[in-house]
Amino acid sequence: MTPTELNLKAKALLETHFDDIVLSGEISKITLHGSGHWYFDLKDERSSIACAMFKGANLKVGFKPAVGNFLELCGSVSLYPESGRYQFIATSMKKAGFGDLEAQFLALKERLQKEGLFDPRFKKSLPKFPKKVGIITSKTSAALQDMLKLIHQKEYFLAKIYIFDALTQGNNAPFSLIRALKKADDMDLDVLIIARGGGSREDLFCFNDENLAREIFKAKTPIISAIGHEIDYVISDFVADFRAPTPSAAIDTLFYSKLDIEQSLDLMEEKLMQLWNYKIQNYENLLLNLSKFFKFNSLPKIIDEKIKQSHNIEKQLNHLLANQMRYNELKLDKLQNAYLQHENFFNKSKKFICIRKNGKIANLEDLKSDDIVILSSQTSQKEAKIL
């Protein structure tokens, strides 16, 4: 029996005995092919199976399935003779709620967000020209080789690269990643990249670990999360200081190429020359204006003008002082005259006599014989009787 004959017999056997199956599970990987066919893996807690839903059948489905969807499929088991790979051929599909992984992811994301672990205020800035860069990933991974190759291509030789080996898949991966992160964070690095290439949802799920997220948040070193592909989002992306869609994108973000640096230096040189020329032109204009000024205003002439100005000011001051003296003399004369007038009046008033009758000042015309009056001067007082 040839492999083809065996595969054909197995295909017939599977299609005969597994032709009306209801299958439930969570999508862990999916490809929506350009032909219109859908190819995806359906998994439970322990196993997964390859599935296909051809265009004629999936046109009746009212939604586009995605990783994390929990589905209920109807269909049959078949075998692809060329490869001997068996798969489930779905004829109908409906959602059965969120899958376990997606539900865990969303619940943790919501909780950490409420705690403030994703708050932009806590994000640390990335260095402009890093000199000590750490990379946490599997030392045997293709992602690491791609990153190192890209650094070499950029000819960025300012930085020393430190590799911290860690598991990036499986149940033990979170512990391994945390251990590598703590070690790297104690080495006073300029920046740290946590990286992993693409994979299925469950392959990347170790980067949704809560303990890992909290270690990333409290790290002293700025951290870039570079996990999977553009469409892959994990908790470490949200809590890190910067999210790169791929490991290679992290290198592009962090490192300038030699050409970029040379072009930047050329641009800076050009701007400095423009600034220098501008300053020189300003100083030349200033010197020109000063030379014109001194040409028409020689130093002796300037000194003569200043002396004349000082003489004029002196004359004005003398004039003001003379006016003030005359004004003060006039005021003094007025005060002296007023004083003399008051003094004369006071001396004359000593000879005046005041006549009072019954406590009131009386005129001579009002007095009669036998009236008793009081005669008062400034120095004495006498009682008298009118005859």
Curated annotation (Swiss-Prot):
Answer whether the UniProt record assigns the keyword Cytoplasm to this protein.
yes
Q: Which UniProt keywords apply?
A: Cytoplasm, Exonuclease, Hydrolase, Nuclease
What this protein catalyses is: Exonucleolytic cleavage in either 5'- to 3'- or 3'- to 5'-direction to yield nucleoside 5'-phosphates
User: For this protein, what is any one GO molecular function term?
Assistant: exodeoxyribonuclease VII activity
Alphabetical list of InterPro entries matching this protein? Exonuc_VII_L (IPR003753), Exonuc_VII_lsu_C (IPR020579), OB-fold_nuc-bd_dom (IPR025824)
Q: Output a single Gene Ontology CC term carried by this record.
A: exodeoxyribonuclease VII complex
Note one Pfam family from the annotation: Exonuc_VII_L
What's its EC? 3.1.11.6
An example GO biological process term is:
DNA catabolic process
Question: In which domain of life is the source organism classified?
Answer: Bacteria
Tell me where in or outside the cell this protein is found: Cytoplasm
How would you classify this enzyme at the top EC level? hydrolase
Function, as annotated: Bidirectionally degrades single-stranded DNA into large acid-insoluble oligonucleotides, which are then degraded further into small acid-soluble oligonucleotides.
Q: Which family does it belong to?
A: Belongs to the XseA family.
Subunit composition?
Heterooligomer composed of large and small subunits.
Q: What is the name attached to this protein's record? A: Exodeoxyribonuclease 7 large subunit
Species of the source = Campylobacter jejuni (strain RM1221)
